[in-house]
């Protein structure tokens, strides 16, 4: 080992190994598929509590729900929800 070495494998050795590509050829596409399913099924809206695109405006309320008074924000939010 050279001076100052941490004893870890060099990055070049890692990315040129067969084992690296066998593992990552499965895990990287799986992560993309999992993310796509998370968003496309709407689970992301449920987990993070954000409104779905068709829930931003209701039939009764078509204006932008913008808070204008920070001290009365709770009351304004309650009015927007109604």
Curated annotation (Swiss-Prot):
Disulfide bonds: none annotated. Its cofactor is heme b. With its partner (PsbF) binds heme. PSII binds additional chlorophylls, carotenoids and specific lipids. Coiled coil: none annotated. InterPro entries: PSII_cyt_b559_asu, PSII_cyt_b559_asu_sf, PSII_cyt_b559_CS, PSII_cyt_b559_N, PSII_cytb559_asu_lum. One of its GO terms (cellular component) is plasma membrane-derived thylakoid membrane. It is a single-pass membrane protein. It holds the Pfam family Cytochrom_B559a. GO terms for biological process: photosynthetic electron transport chain. The chain crosses the membrane at residues 22-36. GO terms for molecular function: electron transfer activity; heme binding; iron ion binding. It is found in: Cellular thylakoid membrane. Signal peptide: none annotated. The keyword Repressor does not apply. Keywords: Electron transport, Heme, Iron, Membrane, Metal-binding, Photosynthesis, Photosystem II, Thylakoid, Transmembrane, Transmembrane helix, Transport. Heme binds at residue 24. This b-type cytochrome is tightly associated with the reaction center of photosystem II (PSII). PSII is a light-driven water:plastoquinone oxidoreductase that uses light energy to abstract electrons from H(2)O, generating O(2) and a proton gradient subsequently used for ATP formation. It consists of a core antenna complex that captures photons, and an electron transfer chain that converts photonic excitation into a charge separation. NCBIfam families: cyt_b559_alpha. Belongs to the PsbE/PsbF family. Heterodimer of an alpha subunit and a beta subunit. PSII is composed of 1 copy each of membrane proteins PsbA, PsbB, PsbC, PsbD, PsbE, PsbF, PsbH, PsbI, PsbJ, PsbK, PsbL, PsbM, PsbT, PsbX, PsbY, PsbZ, Psb30/Ycf12, peripheral proteins PsbO, CyanoQ (PsbQ), PsbU, PsbV and a large number of cofactors. It forms dimeric complexes. This is Cytochrome b559 subunit alpha. It comes from Trichodesmium erythraeum (strain IMS101).
């Amino acid at each position: 080992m050279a001076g100052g070495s941490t004893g870890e494998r060099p990055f070049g050795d890692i990315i040129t190994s067969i084992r690296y590509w066998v593992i990552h050829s499965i895990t990287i596409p799986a992560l993309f598929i999992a993310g796509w399913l998370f968003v496309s099924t709407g689970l992301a809206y449920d987990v993070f509590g954000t409104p779905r695109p068709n829930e931003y405006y209701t039939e009764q309320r078509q204006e932008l729900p913008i808070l204008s008074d920070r001290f009365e924000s709770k009351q304004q939010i309650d009015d927007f929800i109604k």
